[in-house]
Amino acid sequence: MKEFESIINTAWENKDSINGQSDKSILDAINQTIELVDKGELRVAEKNGNEWVVNQWVKKAIMLSFRTHDMDSLSGPYSSWYDKSHLLKGKTANWTKEDHIKAGFRMVPNSPVRKGSFIGKNAVLMPCFVNIGAYVDEGTMVDTWASVGSCAQIGKNCHISGGAGIGGVLEPMQANPTIIEDNCFIGARSEIVEGVIVGEGSVLSMGVFIGQSTKIVYRETGEVIYGKIPPYSVIVPGSIPSKDGKGPALYCAVIIKQVDEKTRSKTSINDLLRD
């Protein structure tokens, strides 16, 4: 692993010259790193105690892979597609029924999952999209038309509701991935982007939008924070009046309370869907 890290970091310094004809050691390091991410044996980010540590070299390997693979086409019964060759067919293109049983997650038709992403056991993928580098942990549901962006990290037993978006890091290029910790509920059509961290057990209502510059306001105290939602927070969309009271109000996210039993009863996952 350390050898891969060293090779990829060196290659990154000369990324403009990297291509499919580069030294075999570089190509092998990139491809094997993506294979390890695909298997869940390596992650773009992992939690160490209370802090998330980003393996920047893994993210670099993913980005370099776009330079080392040529474009290719894929034809289907009703359309054709044109993309980088290592991503065209997706994670499960050559899987047998036994492979699906071993992986242990549900995946309905029209739920593309890209090679180089990992899905944990008992997860449920409705017609959604999971991009390269993403990690979706055990028991999580990604609902219809939701998207999990490149390198995003989703914890255990989360619910990513219909049409929600968890932002990626490849474009625009971000330093850190967006992270949703264990047991979170992300409401329909919400967007969490730009490396924001949603703390464990938090509940976001429908239509909450949070990036690094979004003000997150404690309703009780008026305190404003950025970029990280504390664990077990209940978040709704809100607005902050202009200072002079004449200009337009600006959007914010509001922490209205800590998660309680009433909230949990409304947002708990359904084990019947994960058998």
From Swiss-Prot:
Residues where substrate binds: R106, D143
Protein family according to the UniProt entry: Belongs to the transferase hexapeptide repeat family.
Coiled coil regions, renumbered to chain: none
Localization, UniProt: Cytoplasm
Gene this chain is encoded by: dapD
Quaternary assembly: Homotrimer.
Annotated catalysed reactions: (S)-2,3,4,5-tetrahydrodipicolinate + succinyl-CoA + H2O = (S)-2-succinylamino-6-oxoheptanedioate + CoA
Species of provenance: Pelagibacter ubique (strain HTCC1062)
GO biological processes: diaminopimelate biosynthetic process; lysine biosynthetic process via diaminopimelate
Keywords of this entry: Acyltransferase, Amino-acid biosynthesis, Cytoplasm, Diaminopimelate biosynthesis, Lysine biosynthesis, Repeat, Transferase
Signal peptide: none
GO molecular function terms attached to this record: 2,3,4,5-tetrahydropyridine-2,6-dicarboxylate N-succinyltransferase activity; nucleotidyltransferase activity
Gene Ontology annotations for the cellular component aspect, listed alphabetically: cytoplasm
HAMAP family xrefs: DapD (MF_00811)
EC number: 2.3.1.117
Pfam hit, one: THDPS_N_2
Keyword Glycoprotein: no
UniProt pathway annotation: Amino-acid biosynthesis; L-lysine biosynthesis via DAP pathway; LL-2,6-diaminopimelate from (S)-tetrahydrodipicolinate (succinylase route): step 1/3
Annotated protein name in UniProt: 2,3,4,5-tetrahydropyridine-2,6-dicarboxylate N-succinyltransferase
Domain of life: Bacteria
